[in-house]
């Protein structure tokens, strides 16, 4: 788990869940380079003490900034806790982010269950292949 870059994104209704996730898996996350959209990054940093590289808020282009890192092969894993029950004004940006993860084979979790599987896989060394393809 050397220098892997992880993006954390959470819609407003999922921010508290992201904080709980980050606290629960702090020992794993602090071994990685963490990137996040604006408010999510600030909340995670305050709750855990982990340094978070913060982008713009999602609706202001933060999702696209993370997408650019993915397209440049500079992001290894994305945890995006989406709120599927609330319409998002920047839905095209969200879909573009999901698409770029698929195009570049970047592991992506959009709910807590998948996020936990990915973070435990990361801890078990199952994402070391990302270092080999960089």
From Swiss-Prot:
Substrate binds at residues 11, 15, 37-40, 90. Its EC number is 4.2.3.3. One of its GO terms (molecular function) is methylglyoxal synthase activity. Signal peptide: none annotated. It comes from the Bacteria. CDD domains: MGS (cd01422). The active site is at residue 63. Belongs to the methylglyoxal synthase family. This is Methylglyoxal synthase. It comes from Thermoanaerobacterium thermosaccharolyticum. The gene is mgsA.
């Amino acid at each position: 788990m050397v220098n892997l870059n992880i993006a954390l994104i959470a819609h407003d209704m999922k921010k508290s869940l992201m904080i709980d996730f980050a606290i629960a898996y702090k020992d794993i996350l602090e071994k990685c380079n963490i990137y996040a959209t604006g408010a999510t990054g600030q909340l995670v940093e305050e709750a855990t003490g982990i340094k978070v590289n913060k982008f713009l808020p999602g609706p202001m282009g933060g999702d696209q900034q993370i997408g650019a890192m993915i397209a440049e092969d500079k992001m290894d894993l994305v945890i995006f806790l989406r709120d599927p029950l609330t319409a998002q004004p920047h839905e095209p940006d969200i879909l573009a982010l999901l698409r770029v993860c698929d195009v570049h084979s970047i592991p992506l979790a959009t709910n807590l269950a998948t996020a936990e599987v990915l973070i435990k896989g990361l801890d078990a060394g199952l994402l070391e292949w990302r270092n080999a393809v960089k």
